[in-house]
């Protein structure tokens, strides 16, 4: 760390640079993609582009999100994953057009999540995974339009009943939390009969240790299969034609899906 306790100086984003990073999505949305650019401070110049529909600031080194982010009143999709953010501003509750919020892989604690999140009445996907949450924010129980919630890889010991009562919840990831009862997460998921508890990820998006564990599990499964009788069996997932075509496309669709597809 530099003298005086200051962190590394990140890349400076000018208005012209930001304008050149605007892309039009397949469904006609304006997306500002500033991911993986070494940004350490929220670039205030982008507030002049408040008509964008989607904002991607993921995989940078941003520590603080300013209250002024609420100027993005048309924003439907906000991706802040993989930064150093330890709290969200109260003003985020004013961004009532949000459908998708990803703040996974940051430094968020439960106290760093403002109660104003309960004002996001239209939001459908919230990813809070890979943070330091020791309890589930009660605000989530007020978000009746939620379809997908990520709470994996935190410090959770219990899940409130209000989550199970979310009427439109379809996907919930609560894996790798220190639940006192090892079966608690499975029991909770099973209690929501409508839940689709399936998560896909591409190899390029996994850390080396996770990838190694998955490969070991796959090798073990292949060994078991090779020892089993070779009688013809009906495929469990007939739509997964090949691992390098249909399945890969499905994985990419899940990872990059726009809120407009919900």
UniProtKB/Swiss-Prot annotation:
GO terms for cellular component: cytoplasm. It holds the Pfam family LRR_14. LRR repeats lie at residues 28-49, 51-72, 74-95, 97-118, 122-144, 145-167, 168-189. SMART domains: LRR_TYP (SM00369). Its main location: cytoplasm. Gene3D superfamilies: Ribonuclease Inhibitor. May be involved in the regulation of spermatogenesis and sperm maturation. This is Leucine-rich repeat-containing protein 18. It comes from Mus musculus (Mouse). The gene is Lrrc18.
């Amino acid at each position: 760390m530099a003298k005086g306790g200051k962190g590394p100086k990140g890349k400076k984003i000018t208005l012209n640079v930001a304008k050149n990073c605007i892309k039009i999505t397949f469904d006609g949305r304006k997306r500002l993609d500033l991911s993986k650019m070494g940004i350490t401070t929220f670039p205030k110049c982008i507030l002049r582009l408040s008509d964008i529909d989607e904002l991607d600031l993921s995989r940078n080194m941003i520590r603080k999100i300013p209250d002024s982010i609420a100027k993005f009143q048309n924003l439907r999709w906000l991706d802040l994953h993989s930064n150093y953010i330890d709290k969200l501003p109260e003003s985020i509750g004013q961004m009532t057009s949000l459908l998708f919020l990803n703040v996974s892989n940051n430094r968020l604690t439960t106290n760093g999540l403002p109660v104003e999140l309960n004002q996001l009445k239209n939001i459908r996907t919230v990813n809070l995974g890979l943070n330091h949450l020791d309890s589930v924010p009660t605000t989530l129980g007020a978000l009746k339009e939620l379809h997908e919630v990520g709470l994996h890889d935190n410090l959770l010991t219990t899940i409130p009943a209000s989550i199970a009562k979310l009427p439109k919840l379809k996907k919930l990831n609560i894996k790798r939390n220190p639940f006192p009862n090892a079966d608690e997460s499975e029991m909770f998921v099973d209690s929501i009969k409508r839940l689709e508890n399936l998560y896909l990820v591409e190899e390029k998006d996994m850390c080396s240790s996770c990838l190694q564990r998955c490969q070991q599990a796959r090798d073990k499964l292949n060994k078991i299969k090779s020892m089993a009788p070779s009688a013809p069996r009906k495929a469990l997932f007939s739509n997964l034609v090949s691992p390098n075509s249909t399945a890969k496309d499905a994985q990419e669709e899940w990872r990059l899906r726009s809120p407009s597809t919900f």
